[in-house]
Structures are given as C-alpha cells and as structure tokens.
Amino acid sequence: MGSSEQELVAIVRELGCGPYFLGTFDKRFPGFMAPHKLACAIVNTAGRETGGVHWLALAWNPKNRTCYLFDPFGFSDERLKQIYQFEYEGLLKRSALASTPDHCITLIKSTQTVQGPFSAACGLFCCMFLHAFVNWPTSPMERNPTMDLLTGVPNSMLQSPQVVPTLRHNQERLYRFLAQRSPYFQRHCERIKKATAFDQMKNNM
C-alpha cells in the first residue's frame, strides 16, 4: 500500500513545490543537474518494476551548495543499504559534477525518526518536508513552522513502545497539515489514510 506516484505529485504541487519539483523517481534518480536552480524530488529506495518500497525526499539548494536527504525513519547510510540496498553516493557524485565548479557539495541528512515502524506514510512525510524546503531552503529539516509540527525521536528507539504515542501523534499532525493545504488530500482523505495507516505494514505481515 502506501502512496502512489500520482498522489505524491498532486499533493506536492498543491503544497506550492511545483516550480522546483522534478518529480517522483525510483532508485535510479539521476541527481540534480541544474547548477543554479532550487530543486527537489521524491525518490524510492527500490526500482519502479518492484512497485516501490520506501520513499525518501531529496532537495538541492544552490545558494549554500547543499543537498538535503530526508528519510522519515532517519536511518544511517549503512542501514539504508542493509535494509533497502539503497545507496545515494552515485547520485551525489553526479549532482556535484553537474552543479558545482569544484565538484564539492554538502550533504545534510535527517537522523531522527518521525514515522512509526509499521506506518506506510513515508511518501506523505516527504511531501511535508518538501513544503518546508521550498519555504525555508536553508533550514528545511528543523527550526521552521512546518517540520516543527513533528517530534523526532532517536532512530535507535524506532521499535520502542515508549515512542509509539509520539510517532502516532506525528502522523495525526501530518494528516491535519495536508488536509489544511491540499484539496487532493481532502477529496481522497479516507482512501489515503487507509493506505498509509499507522499500522498498515503490520497488517500486511
């Protein structure tokens, strides 16, 4: 279940990200190739032929030559590779070669968990992050009115019953945020909530 590419594109555009949004991609995302343009994308950790596994958001700010990688689970590089066989070194290298004179960029990656371990709302959390990015491109991860609606917990506590109320509250705030800003989400609210439910992945086990 989870979010389809069509849903994510519709919601992202209604959040005002349209001029900067490159689209949804599978793990073969080519990177950011326009050197002077603010840009962002939603990228799956798997190939499109698999139907997809987990959504991440990537964003490029040319002013500070920084690439932001938002993972709602806040997994380390090693865990992303271990769990999803996903590596982003290649796309970072391609982005650096295309976007900066000295081929150097800064990577800022989310390290905290905002999504429950059995939630299928990763794509929707990515939409929320991209709203933060286009409005506050120098501090999209935190210290802005959008992402400050969520409470992050250490990734090491992802499976802890102690943080379940916090992560469930995050998902409720996510839905509320989208309902206030996306007519598409409003129209399809019931179906989207069912497909991205907090315990969706547990139900599929």
Swiss-Prot record:
Keywords linked to the UniProt accession: Autocatalytic cleavage, Disulfide bond, DNA-binding, Host nucleus, Hydrolase, Late protein, Protease, Thiol protease, Virion
EC number: 3.4.22.39
SUPFAM superfamilies for the chain: Cysteine proteinases
Pfam families: Peptidase_C5
Predominant subcellular localization, coarse grouping: virion
GO biological process, one term: proteolysis
Site feature: Cleavage: G51, G52
Regulation of catalytic or functional activity: Requires DNA and protease cofactor for maximal activation. Inside nascent virions, becomes partially activated by binding to the viral DNA, allowing it to cleave the cofactor that binds to the protease and fully activates it. Actin, like the viral protease cofactor, seems to act as a cofactor in the cleavage of cytokeratin 18 and of actin itself.
GO CC entries: host cell nucleus; virion component
Induction of its expression: Expressed in the late phase of the viral replicative cycle.
Miscellaneous remark of the record: All late proteins expressed from the major late promoter are produced by alternative splicing and alternative polyadenylation of the same gene giving rise to non-overlapping ORFs. A leader sequence is present in the N-terminus of all these mRNAs and is recognized by the viral shutoff protein to provide expression although conventional translation via ribosome scanning from the cap has been shut off in the host cell.
HAMAP family for the chain: ADV_PRO
UniProt record similarity statement: Belongs to the peptidase C5 family.
Protein name: Protease
Organism of origin: Human adenovirus F serotype 40 (HAdV-40)
